[in-house]
């Protein structure tokens, strides 16, 4: 008996998955310890697409800034964790890592917050 060929319906092309991540730098920018434009430039130079930094894959990854929020949009697989890694690298480079931390405040956004050190020190002083 001859093998039976199954008819498989071929699906159309998958629509491009657009990933959109936001970095909220409102607090440090308002306090004047960080420059959002400088951070945006850092991301443009450092984000790697296909193993190459600097060119953003010819428009595959775009970075936009509105006041103190930076939005990274990607049409290729892009990790949110990679964005956190680059943000921490920027903070370390500018000696801000001791005061700021990167916190996920939603599924597709990060926020830069201050460490809550002052409250702990005040509580310790009250106990003495």
Curated annotation (Swiss-Prot):
InterPro entries documented for this protein: Ribosomal_eL22 (IPR002671), Ribosomal_eL22_sf (IPR038526)
Post-translational modification N6-succinyllysine, affected residues: 69
A Pfam family this chain is assigned to: Ribosomal_L22e
Subcellular location: Cytoplasm
Modified residue annotations for Phosphothreonine: 62
Principal subcellular localisation of the protein: cytoplasm
Keywords: Cytoplasm, Heparin-binding, Phosphoprotein, Ribonucleoprotein, Ribosomal protein, RNA-binding
GO CC field: cytoplasm; cytosol; cytosolic large ribosomal subunit; glutamatergic synapse; nucleus; postsynapse; presynapse; ribonucleoprotein complex
Modified positions (Phosphoserine) in chain numbering: 66
Single GO MF annotation: identical protein binding
GO terms (BP aspect): alpha-beta T cell differentiation; translation at postsynapse; translation at presynapse
Function text: Component of the large ribosomal subunit. The ribosome is a large ribonucleoprotein complex responsible for the synthesis of proteins in the cell.
Subunit structure, as described in the record: Component of the large ribosomal subunit.
Family: Belongs to the eukaryotic ribosomal protein eL22 family.
Stated name of the protein: Large ribosomal subunit protein eL22
Organism: Mus musculus (Mouse)
């Amino acid at each position: 008996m001859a093998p039976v060929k199954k008819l498989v319906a071929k699906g159309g092309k998958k629509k491009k998955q657009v990933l959109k991540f936001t970095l909220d730098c409102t607090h440090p920018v308002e306090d004047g310890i960080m420059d959002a434009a400088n951070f945006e430039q850092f991301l443009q130079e450092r984000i790697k697409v296909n193993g190459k930094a600097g060119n953003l894959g010819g428009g595959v990854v775009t970075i936009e800034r509105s006041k103190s929020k930076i939005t990274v949009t990607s049409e290729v697989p892009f990790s949110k964790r990679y964005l956190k890694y680059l943000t921490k690298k920027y903070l370390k480079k500018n000696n801000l890592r001791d005061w700021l931390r990167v916190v996920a405040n939603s599924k597709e956004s990060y926020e830069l917050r201050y460490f809550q050190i002052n409250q702990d020190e005040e509580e310790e002083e009250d106990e003495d």
